[in-house]
Amino acid sequence: GVELTLNSLVSGLLKQNHFINVVAPFNSKLSDNCSSANLYTVKGEEQISWQHQDYSTETKISESSIVSKMIAKALSLTKDCDAIINLSYDLLPICKTLEVDYPILHLISMGDESLEIKNIISKVYAKHPNNFAFHTRSQASDYPFIKDPIILGNGFEISQYTFQEKKEGPLAWVGRVSPEKGLEDAVYVASKLGEELNVWGFIEDKKYASRIEELYPSGQICWKGYLKTKE
């Protein structure tokens, strides 16, 4: 998801001769086609993803959190840069847009998963509408105050993929296996077409995966596991 978006975005900007710094959690690596970017990694306390919390959960940000450390590092590198591009769906980077005299741009990759984040997006968007972009219009519609969303679709490094010219199945589905991803819709389509569905991705919610399997005949879903792009 975000990892692929980041590598594609960095690769595309490098091809246009931009100077890029990337700030990421400790042990992160960039893909080979992003090797000319500067990678800065930071250690910190991880937090639970927003899609796994209640909609009304209030944010608790500690100074030791990975998000706090990353935004602090990014701000320390602004002397030689034009802007910060934030790819995290998190409260702190969005709040910072109003607190610092430096452009922070946000690529929002999720729908409305948190009331608190929705409210801060609304507050910041009112003053800086051009600082936000979304992946799809459907996703942006989760935020009714966004009147004319900037849409930035996911780019792909085409050279890393091999085109398969096949008119017959099986069908493929790629993504983390958890309820918000909607795998059941893909299985439904495959069953209506009489095709097997190959599923690539980390099975985060095993109970969810089992429930879907029980709804369809044996062999309808073929679990392929979690692979790197090159695989």
Where on the chain are the PLM-derived regions?
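Catalytic cores of nucleotide-sugar-dependent glycosyltransferases that transfer UDP/GDP/TDP-activated
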Residues: 1-231
